[in-house]
């Protein structure tokens, strides 16, 4: 978790530097960097607004969902929480690995979206419909990646809850648990409440894009 999250953080940091560089020199060609991108994204080395939106959407997603959260919860939390409650490991180590591979797969799918026709997601990292239904193919990849990441978070939340409830050392009541363990437990419960509707919305958006449904498309509203 830690090494993978750090790699994603470095990539997100690079996107941020590219955005700030263009903001520092508006309407000017970026030396060296501008030559590395195609004319469809940076004609003459000047960043198009659509490409800037792609960088903004992917930067926000990567830093939050692929960097900070996996580093703080997946890496630090999975290591520290069992130590603080006297457990040898998390309740479901294999579920932990499944959560990691969902996280890794989601991150890779998101990064691949930069190389598909039309580029990465442009509708913002919150991906509100109906704008998200009309974006490029990269938006589809972004949605698939988000579904993987949400699934990873749900699996991890279940693991944290069961570990905290079932594997506490004898004599440790809820009132004696460290504040960090309480924070992870409450956060896990909140994720179980908030993320299933979010994942369902992502699946419905995917169906609008790929299966011809109209859950969010204005044309399907009565």
Mark where each language-model region is:
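Membrane-embedded and interfacial regions of multi-pass energy-transducing membrane proteins
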Residues: 1-222
């Amino acid at each position: 978790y830690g090494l993978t999250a750090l790699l994603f953080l470095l990539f997100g940091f690079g996107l941020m530097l590219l955005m700030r560089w263009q903001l520092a020199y508006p309407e000017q060609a970026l030396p060296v960097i501008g030559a590395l991108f195609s004319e469809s994204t940076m004609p003459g080395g000047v960043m198009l607004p659509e490409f800037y939106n792609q960088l903004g959407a992917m930067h926000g997603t990567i830093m939050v969902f692929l960097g900070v959260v996996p580093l703080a919860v997946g890496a630090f939390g999975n290591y520290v929480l069992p130590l603080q409650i006297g457990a040898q490991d998390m309740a479901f180590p294999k579920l932990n690995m499944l959560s990691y591979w969902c996280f890794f797969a989601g991150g890779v799918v998101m990064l691949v979206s930069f190389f598909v026709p039309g580029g990465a997601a442009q509708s913002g990292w919150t991906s509100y419909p109906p704008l998200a239904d009309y974006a490029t193919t990269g938006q589809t990849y972004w949605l698939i990646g988000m579904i993987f990441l949400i699934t990873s978070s749900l699996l991890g939340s279940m693991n944290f809850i069961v570990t905290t409830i079932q594997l506490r050392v004898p004599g440790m009541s809820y009132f004696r648990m460290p504040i960090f363990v309480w924070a992870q437990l409450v956060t896990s419960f909140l994720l179980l409440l908030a993320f299933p509707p979010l994942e369902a919305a992502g699946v419905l958006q995917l169906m609008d894009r790929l299966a011809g449904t109209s859950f969010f498309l204005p044309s399907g509203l009565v």
